[in-house]
Amino acid sequence: MKYLLISLALWLGMVGIHGTELELSETQRRGLQVALEEFHKHPPVQWAFQEIGVDNANDMVFSAGTFVRLEFKLQQTSCFKKDWKNPECKIKANGRKRKCLACIKLDPRGKVLGRMVHCPILKQGLQQELQESQCNRITQAGEDPRSHFFPGQFAFSRALKHK
C-alpha cells in the first residue's frame, strides 16, 4: 500500500508539472525571452531563475504590433544572475519560487514597444489590480491615440461641419 501511495504521489507530481505545459507560439516565446531578460536585469535579483511552467499565454494583434500576456512560474537556480542563460544551471530543490505576470508589446519586426514584468515571491501573492492597470497601459503602447473611435464621434463632427 505504501508503494502504491508513493507511486501515485510521484505520478501526480509529474502530471502537475508537465501536464499543464502550454505550447507557446513564436511571438509568445519571444515575449517570454524578453520577460526573463527584464527580470534578470532587476538589481535586487542576485540568483538566476529558470522558468518552470507557463500557466497562461495570450497574444492580441494591434495596428502597432502584438501584445503578449504571460503568466508563468520561476524557480531559483544555483547560478548567479549573470549566468542565467547557462543551461548547466540546476534548479535548487528549496530555491525561491516566483509567480510572474509579464505584458510585452512587440512591433511586427520583434522590437519591444513596451514591457511590464512583475514577479513577486510566490508566498506574497499577486497585487492583481495594480498589475492589471500596468498591463493595460502596455496594451496601448505604440498605438495611435486617435485611432480609437467612440460612438457618435463622426455624427457630431458632420453635424458641426454643415452649419
Swiss-Prot record:
Residues 1-20 form the signal peptide. Residues 158-163 form a propeptide. It is found in: Secreted. Gene3D superfamilies: 3.10.450.10. It comes from the Eukaryota. GO terms for molecular function: signaling receptor binding. Secreted in an inactive precursor form, prochemerin, which is proteolytically processed by a variety of extracellular proteases to generate forms with differing levels of bioactivity. For example, the removal of six amino acids results in chemerin-157, which exhibits the highest activity, while removal of seven amino acids results in chemerin-156 which has slightly less activity. Some proteases are able to cleave at more than one site and chemerin forms may be sequentially processed by different enzymes to modulate activity levels. GO terms for cellular component: extracellular matrix; extracellular region; extracellular space. Keywords: Chemotaxis, Differentiation, Disulfide bond, Inflammatory response, Secreted, Signal. GO terms for biological process: cell differentiation; chemotaxis; inflammatory response; innate immune response; positive regulation of chemotaxis; positive regulation of fat cell differentiation; positive regulation of protein phosphorylation; regulation of insulin receptor signaling pathway. Disulfide bonds join 79-89, 100-119, 103-135. Adipocyte-secreted protein (adipokine) that regulates adipogenesis, metabolism and inflammation through activation of the chemokine-like receptor 1 (CMKLR1). Also acts as a ligand for CMKLR2. Can also bind to C-C chemokine receptor-like 2 (CCRL2), but with a lower affinity than it does to CMKLR1 or CMKLR2. Positively regulates adipocyte differentiation, modulates the expression of adipocyte genes involved in lipid and glucose metabolism and might play a role in angiogenesis, a process essential for the expansion of white adipose tissue. PANTHER family: RETINOIC ACID RECEPTOR RESPONDER PROTEIN 2. This is Retinoic acid receptor responder protein 2. It comes from Cricetulus griseus.
